[in-house]
Amino acid sequence: MTVLKMTDLDLQGKRVLIREDLNVPVKDGVVTSDARILASLPTIKLALEKGAAVMVCSHLGRPTEGEFSAENSLKPVADYLSRALGREVPLVADYLGGVEVKAGDIVLFENVRFNKGEKKNADELAQQYAALCDVFVMDAFGTAHRAEGSTHGVAKFAKVAAAGPLLAAELDALGKALGNPAKPMAAIVAGSKVSTKLDVLNSLSQICDQLIVGGGIANTFLAAAGHPVGKSLYEPDLLDTARAIAAKVSVPLPVDVVVAKEFAESAAATVKLIADVADDDMILDIGPQTAAQFAELLKSSRTILWNGPVGVFEFDQFGNGTKVLAQAIADSAAFSIAGGGDTLAAIDKYGVAQQISYISTGGGAFLEFVEGKVLPAVEVLEARAKA
C-alpha cells in the first residue's frame, strides 16, 4: 500500500488542511470521551512543529446536511484542543471562501457536515476545500470507508494529498494483523447480530486458527449447534450460515453462560451450564469456565484481533467475560489489534489500553478493512501517490 506520508513532507510555511476524526460524544457542551481527540494530537502537534499554517476539520454527529445545529457544533472540541495544546484554537464557522492562518498557528473548522454536498462528495465543495490548502492530510481512519467531500473529494483536487501519521499507523497495523499474521491467530468477534458481521466472520474464517464469538452472534452459533438459548437474542434464519462458518474454522462455543430473566441494570445474574439454559433465560455473558478456556486460547496465540465485548459489560454483573478476555489479551505476548466502538469502551473500563499493541480508532472503517473491502479515502491517496 503506497501512499504519500505527511511525515515525509516539508510543511514549512505551507497551508495544511488536516481531516481528523473528532466525532466524539458530547454532553452539556463537554466532551465525555476524548480518545479520538487524543489520538489526533500527535499529528496536529507535528504539523505545527513543522511550521505549517494548520487547519483542522472533522464531522460530529449526524446533523441535517447544510444546516447549523448547536448540538453538533465542534465548539466543545475547540475548547478541548485549546486546553490540550496550551493555546487558543479558534473555531471558524465561515471558511469556504478562504481563511487567514499564519505559519505556526492553528484553527478548527466548524462541522463539515454543515456544508451542503459533504456527504454526497460533491466536486464543487471538494474543490473549495482543496483551494484552502497547499497540502491535504487525511488522518481520519474512522471515516476512510466513506467517500465524502472532506475525506475523498478534497484528496482528488488538493495540490498534494497525503496520509497523516495516525492513518498511516492504522494501515500498517491492520496490514500486519491481516496481511501476513503471525500464527496461531485468534479473533474475537462479538455483537448483537451475525448478519451485521457476516463478511467479517467469513473473511476471518479464512485466516484465523480460532474464531471466538460473543454476544448475540454466539447465541446464533449455540442455537446452530443444537444448544438451548432461551429467549436470548439470536437469528434463527442464519443457523445454516453459522454452521457453514464453523465448518471452515474452529469456533469454540461457551460451556457455561451468565443468564438473567430480563435485560436490565438491576437484573440478577446466574451462572449456568449451557445445557441448563431455561426457556425464559437471556444469555448476557459467557460463564467463568468459558472465560478461562478462551483466555488459554488467547495465551497461545501470536496474533489477536478483537472486535466487540463478549457480554453486556456495561452492567457489571455481565462484564466478567469481557474483563477476563481483555486481561488475557493484555497479558499476551501476541501482536494484538482492537477496534470498534464498544471494544474501545471495554478497553477503557478495564484499563488495558497500554498493553494492547494497536487500538484502531475506526469502527465501520476497521470492520470494512477486516472484510477486505477497499476504503475510498485510502484508494484516492494511493491513486494520487502513483500520479
Swiss-Prot record:
Matches recorded under Pfam families: PGK
Pathway linked to the protein: Carbohydrate degradation; glycolysis; pyruvate from D-glyceraldehyde 3-phosphate: step 2/5
Gene3D superfamilies attached to this UniProt entry: Phosphoglycerate kinase, N-terminal domain
Catalytic activity: (2R)-3-phosphoglycerate + ATP = (2R)-3-phospho-glyceroyl phosphate + ADP
Main location per the UniProt record: cytoplasm
A GO biological process held by the record: gluconeogenesis
InterPro entries registered for this protein in UniProt: Phosphoglycerate_kinase, Phosphoglycerate_kinase_CS, Phosphoglycerate_kinase_N, Phosphoglycerate_kinase_sf
Sequence positions that bind substrate: D21, L22, N23, R36, H59, L60, G61, R62, R113, R146
GO cellular component entries: cytosol
Highest taxon listed in the record's lineage: Bacteria
An MF annotation (GO) of this entry: phosphoglycerate kinase activity
E.C. code: 2.7.2.3
Subcellular locations according to the entry: Cytoplasm
Keywords noted in UniProt: ATP-binding, Cytoplasm, Glycolysis, Kinase, Nucleotide-binding, Transferase
Record carries keyword Manganese: no
Binding site for ATP: K197, E314, G340, G341, D342, T343
HAMAP family: Phosphoglyc_kinase
Homology family: Belongs to the phosphoglycerate kinase family.
Quaternary structure and partners: Monomer.
Protein name: Phosphoglycerate kinase
Organism: Pseudomonas fluorescens (strain ATCC BAA-477 / NRRL B-23932 / Pf-5)
Lineage: Bacteria, Pseudomonadati, Pseudomonadota, Gammaproteobacteria, Pseudomonadales
